[in-house]
Amino acid sequence: MPQQNYLDELTPAFTPLLAIKEASRCLLCHDAPCSQACPAQTDPGKFIRSIYFRNFKGAAETIRENNALGAVCARVCPTEKLCQSGCTRAGVDAPIDIGRLQRFVTDFEQQTGMEIYQPGTKTLGKVAIIGAGPAGLQASVTLTNQGYDVTIYEKEAHPGGWLRNGIPQFRLPQSVLDAEIARIEKMGVTIKCNNEIGKTLTLEQLKAENRAVLVTVGLSSGSGLPLFEHSDVEIAVDFLLRARQAQGDISIPQSALIIGGGDVAMDVASTLKVLGCQAVTCVAREELDEFPASEKEFASARELGVSIIDGFTPVAVEGNKVTFKHVRLSGELTMAADKIILAVGQHARLDDFAKLEPQRNTIKTQNYQTRDPQVFAAGDIVEGDKTVVYAVKTGKEAAEAIHHYLEGACSC
């Protein structure tokens, strides 16, 4: 792979002709499996047909009907595990590149100034959302379309959550995220940044001022390991935030060792390679057949030159040297690097939601409703997958649950 820039997307975009050519490979399945496999119900089968018939506006309308973050999901979704996994075309040669087609459509939407979303009526009262990540943003759109006056309270200086603070710009450009958020604000959604529960406002205050409250705080804090408690290591989320805020203008070591095998570990490793680190190695306790990273992330990291060692877990650390033991076999492996980064998981900060009785990183809900009937939860803090598209799914479903509750249409 040629030398990359942190601000340039790794995957090239389709031109209109290439998009139509790719869409023409679609077998136009009845009850398309790809559409059944999208958690956000984005309906790839339908928008691919529209692309094939040169109806790009219709394709954009299909995507936006169920996904307020269509341009984001087009870039970061593990499509090989979701919509593309059911593509019938795979039985002929290769599945349709659904992610790049969705990216083409949403880019076309932005470039041509389409205005698919309309301002909300705000006739059904006020709803507050805590957290401006993917679940909160999607929920705000669904609630606004239903007629609610929605305000999102975000603790950071800018909205977006992990989309802004964690995902590298060569995977998700800031301009793409900014355009998605601007589209949502144009509907009439109010986003108030620098507002954190427990500091500038309380949950009880929001309950008093709104008909319902939706909690969508994410897993924004990186986890460590006791073994490295006194070592000079950096947590993955801190490294990614530092690189993102500096737009890649950070000092880079000659060699780096990343402990972990998920998508965050791949993002760290890829960022280091893109920024010029000569030797980057990821060591994960999972073996390759159970590797947690998506195939797309894994392949991208390998193409950039990242070395992957599977099936090893750290057992000792001394300075810049880490000793690993294989999870099944005997024998040890010792590696040294200028920098060690831990990518072993993330957790939520739920201390200010004690009344909702959170357990570790989860708030228990029934149909997204917490033990407090006025308070709902969605996103990473409810049980389930931790992908952006799943957060979109839960945000939309939680908004629908709020609407049913407020309108007295359910027994919850």
Swiss-Prot record:
Stated EC number for the protein is: 1.3.1.1
Which Gene3D superfamilies does the UniProt record give?
A: Alpha-helical ferredoxin (1.10.1060.10), FAD/NAD(P)-binding domain (3.50.50.60)
Q: Which Pfam families match?
A: Fer4_20, Pyr_redox_2
Quote the record's binding site residues for NAD(+): 286
Give an example GO molecular function. Answer: dihydropyrimidine dehydrogenase (NAD+) activity
Member of which family? Belongs to the NADH dehydrogenase family.
- Write out the function statement from the record: Involved in pyrimidine base degradation. Catalyzes physiologically the reduction of uracil to 5,6-dihydrouracil (DHU) by using NADH as a specific cosubstrate. It also catalyzes the reverse reaction and the reduction of thymine to 5,6-dihydrothymine (DHT).
Q: What is this protein called?
A: NAD-dependent dihydropyrimidine dehydrogenase subunit PreT
Against PANTHER family, the record matches this protein to: DIHYDROPYRIMIDINE DEHYDROGENASE [NADP(+)] (PTHR43073:SF2)
Arranged from A to Z, the UniProt key words for this protein are: NAD, Oxidoreductase
**Which SUPFAM superfamilies does its entry note?**
alpha-helical ferredoxin, Nucleotide-binding domain
| Subunit structure, as described in the record | Heterotetramer of 2 PreA and 2 PreT subunits.
* InterPro entries hit by this protein: DPD_II (IPR028261), FAD/NAD-bd_sf (IPR036188), FAD/NAD-binding_dom (IPR023753), Helical_ferredxn (IPR009051)
Q: Which reaction does this chain catalyze?
A: 5,6-dihydrouracil + NAD(+) = uracil + NADH + H(+); 5,6-dihydrothymine + NAD(+) = thymine + NADH + H(+)
